[in-house]
């Protein structure tokens, strides 16, 4: 299925091209991608199917690792807040929906502080990456998403 169609179906509140730019930056469109954060263990290879991804993610989380999962690289610490399981986070539609919810929440909070929509979007993207309205701008993440959105 075409990604833009999938994004529209699963996350209609976020422009499909915006979501595509985030996903390209986060996972390179790999639905089974796992990123280990904070100097954690590195995977010797990325999972190639959902069963491998779920098993690897559960093992990493049980071992105390902080990880990002799936297309939108949903952080393991967000699963409870989002009402998701590890199995669900590797469902492409649920992952895109979760990514959109996180971005929407960030945008709502940023908009309350920043009137200009484009500036609020930059801050929302920054928070998507780092949890902070400024760090994702400083570390180049927001620029990378912007560049990926133009390709």
PLM regions and their residue ranges:
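Eukaryotic N-terminal accessory cofactor-binding modules
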Residues: 42-44
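Non-catalytic cell-wall polysaccharide-engagement segments
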Residues: 1-18, 25-33, 46-72, 76-151
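Early exported N-terminus immediately downstream of N-terminal targeting peptides
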Residues: 34-39
